[in-house]
Swiss-Prot record:
Keywords: DNA damage, DNA repair. Residues 368-412 are annotated as: Disordered. InterPro entries: DNA_mismatch_repair_CS (IPR014762), DNA_mismatch_repair_MutL (IPR020667), DNA_mismatch_S5_2-like (IPR013507), HATPase_C_sf (IPR036890), MutL/Mlh/PMS (IPR002099), MutL/Mlh/Pms-like (IPR038973), MutL_C (IPR014790), MutL_C_dimsub (IPR042120). This protein is involved in the repair of mismatches in DNA. It is required for dam-dependent methyl-directed DNA mismatch repair. May act as a 'molecular matchmaker', a protein that promotes the formation of a stable complex between two or more DNA-binding proteins in an ATP-dependent manner without itself being part of a final effector complex. It comes from Lactobacillus delbrueckii subsp. bulgaricus (strain ATCC BAA-365 / Lb-18). Belongs to the DNA mismatch repair MutL/HexB family. It comes from the Bacteria. Disulfide bonds: none annotated. Residues 375-408 have a biased composition (Basic and acidic residues). This is DNA mismatch repair protein MutL. CDD domains: HATPase_MutL-MLH-PMS-like (cd16926), MutL_Trans (cd00782). GO terms for cellular component: mismatch repair complex. GO terms for molecular function: ATP binding; ATP hydrolysis activity; ATP-dependent DNA damage sensor activity; mismatched DNA binding.
């Protein structure tokens, strides 16, 4: 049996470092928090090679006396608490006295510090051992330089991400700290280039502008609320300014950034149903009695125990709701918007031109079925007056079609006998084009959940849909038949599958049709997002987004893919947001993600189909990569055999 023995101080420091110092961003966090606790009003962070080579944090705080330097690098030595009572009444960001000892255990550290006297102190540590200490000259404050992180624990280096990812983590933590302390001027520089600078004038909205961009700051609403235990102040975005993840929500408790799902959910509850499944940009600063907060539950202190959490949640929800109500009251009661042609709202639209050279992406189900094929090369953007005249003529024509459809529509449409007088012609060239566009491997997702009334044959045949005979439709669902089996088709999911297949095929073949802009559009980003997107410009070009770096956290867009529909700036912003929030790293997975989101955005509502439109939908599903579901896994087709129908009606029992 092995004997119990006491571990060396250096080994215990390395063990502690494993909990506290995970990556370069952890070093930055600990040193900046120490500077804040030292009452600094200016803090400068400089990193080289994403902090892997060197990290420097300089402040104008109180400094450390010469005879206290050794103690500062000893484990569990601190000036922030004195006894057990202080442990439950913590008013500082740090309190354990582990940070400097943990950093010095896994890196080379040099400190230059002064309390404002005539003599400053310079000292160096490596592997937890002091190398030297000497007098020096310096203004009041402290500068700590950390180099060669994990030099003596190379196994830790294997778990670090790419330099770009490590830099983004540093940017993120500095952003959060800056939002929690608008009274402090914070500067972050990487390899000599300034990424962030806040003025330190206490103006939170100005810090939001510096971090997320001026346009975001202009759409932020002030939230305020308080009760006997908590004081809440912050900024939340208008309901129409959203992101696809919670990453833009910062909750700061007594100046400390924390992660708390319940408080985040309380924030979302304040928006009601206005977010549409997305998330706002928000900064909530909460002041609470330290006795209500237990910080000593997590090595990085990002998770805390909070008394009266439900009361605080209600406070947050009511504050956000009130801010949004004030915004609604300030908005115009009535707004004039362009009136759309009724056929664009009530009828599915086509752009199927089999006899025309495909110079642009066919906008599936988005143009009128009666539309005459346009000349080759004609773009979606036309002369306004000409478009209006054309739309009026088409509107009249389509109304007549709808009337005829209601009075003379057959009971079903045989897919093999679609007539030319339906004003829709299928040709071999178009059929071949569809096959080429949609010949993709099966959807790489999980197994589809089996329907209670779906036989095993469905699962075996789900990658192949037979030629169906249309029976009818009801409220956006199609009913069809083949071989005595009944097929139920959700037209939205089916259209999304076809849209997904076509967009993905274009992306993978790099055959995007683009719409150029007379003047480029400017997109502002946070420092974090800007740094991430700069490296993805080649991928954006593959997606059909021609963008270039414009500096100052902005990108210029010169053209966009024609499969983006709706308001261009909104659609592009949502697409970029999806890329930023995605955890996918390989290009193919990102292309699938973009295609799926674009299909979901482009096809969002059920409409009544004409017989020809329904026939075409079923025909094209035969060549889909997975006709039985859309890219998100939503069921598109359900097959009921005669045996299934008998079971439903309990026949034979």
């Amino acid at each position: 049996m092995a004997k119990i023995h006491e571990l060396s101080e250096n080994l215990t420091n390395q063990i502690a470092a494993g909990e506290v110092i995970e990556r370069p961003a952890s070093v930055v966090k600990e040193l900046v928090e120490n500077a804040i606790d030292a009452q600094a009003s200016r803090i400068r962070v400089e990193v080289q090679h994403s902090g892997l080579k060197q990290i420097s944090v300089q402040d104008n705080g109180s400094g450390i006396a010469p005879d206290q330097v050794d103690l500062a690098f000893m484990r569990h030595a601190t000036s922030k608490i004195q006894d057990e009572h202080d442990l439950f009444n913590i008013a500082t960001l740090g309190f354990r006295g582990e940070a400097l000892a943990s950093i010095a255990a896994v890196a080379h550290v040099e400190i230059l510090t002064s309390t404002g006297g005539q003599t400053a102190t310079r000292a160096a540590f490596a592997g937890g051992v002091k190398k030297f200490q000497e007098d020096a000259g310096s203004a009041k404050g402290t500068k700590i330089t950390v180099g060669d992180i994990f030099y003596n624990t190379p196994a830790r280096l294997k778990y670090l991400k790419s330099p770009k990812t490590e830099l983004l983590k540093i940017v993120d933590i500095v952003n959060r700290i800056a939002l929690g302390h608008p009274e402090i001027s914070l500067t972050l520089a990487s390899d000599g280039k300034v990424l962030l600078r806040t003025p330190g004038n206490g103006n939170l909205k100005q810090d939001v502008a510096n971090i997320y961009g001026r346009k975001v700051a202009e759409k932020m609403l002030t939230v305020e609320n308080e009760d006997p235990d908590f004081t809440l102040y912050g900024l939340v975005s208008e309901a129409n300014l959203t992101r696809s993840s919670r990453n833009f929500i910062s909750i700061l408790l007594n100046g400390r950034y924390i992660k708390n799902y319940q408080l985040s959910s309380a924030l979302l509850d304040g928006y009601g149903n206005k977010l549409g499944g997305k998330y706002p940009i928000a900064v909530l600063a909460i002041e609470a009695d330290p006795l209500l907060v237990d910080v000593n539950v997590h090595p990085t202190k990002e998770e805390v125990r909070l008394s009266k959490e439900k009361e605080l949640s209600r406070l947050i929800t009511s504050a956000v709701t009130e801010a949004l109500m004030d915004e609604d009251e300030a908005s115009p009661l009535f707004q004039l918007t362009p009136f759309k042609d009724k056929t664009q709202l009530d009828q599915l639209e086509f752009n199927l031109k089999p006899n025309v050279v495909d110079t642009r992406r066919p906008d599936d189900f988005q143009l009128e079925v009666s539309q005459v094929a346009e000349p080759e090369g004609k773009t979606d953007i036309t002369n306004k007056k000409g478009t209006e005249t054309k739309e009026k003529a088409e509107k009249k024509e389509n109304k007549q079609e709808e009337k005829e459809e209601k009075t003379s529509a057959p009971e079903y449409v045989d897919l093999n006998q679609v007539r030319e007088d339906d004003q829709y012609v299928l040709t071999k060239s178009w059929d071949q084009h569809v096959k080429e566009q949609t010949a993709l491997p099966p959807f790489a997702g999980g197994e589809e959940a089996a329907s209670p009334v779906t036989s095993k044959a469905d699962q075996l045949l789900r990658q192949h849909l037979p030629a169906l005979r249309l029976l009818g439709q009801m409220e956006g669902y199609l009913l069809a038949e083949h071989g005595g089996d009944l097929y139920l088709i959700d037209q939205v999911a089916a259209r999304r599958r076809l849209e997904y297949d076509q967009i993905l095929a274009s992306l993978e073949k790099d055959e995007n049709y683009q719409q150029g802009l007379l003047e480029p559009l400017v997109f502002d980003f946070s420092v974090y997002d800007y740094q991430k997107l700069k490296d993805q410009l080649p991928l954006l070009r593959q997606l059909g987004l021609e963008m270039e770096d414009f500096g100052q956290n902005t990108l210029l867009m010169h053209s966009y893919p024609t499969w983006l529909k709706g308001e261009v700036t909104v659609q592009v912003r949502e697409l970029l947001d999806q890329l930023l929030s995605s955890r996918e790293n390989d290009g193919k997975s990102l292309l699938k993600l973009v295609a799926a989101k674009a299909a979901e955005s482009n096809v969002s509502r059920r409409v009544n189909l004409t017989g020809a439109e329904a026939a075409d939908l079923l025909l094209r599903l035969q060549t889909a990569s997975d006709p039985y579901r859309d890219a998100s896994g939503q069921v598109a087709v359900v097959r009921l055999s005669q045996n299934d129908l008998s079971k439903l009606f309990k026949k034979g029992k």
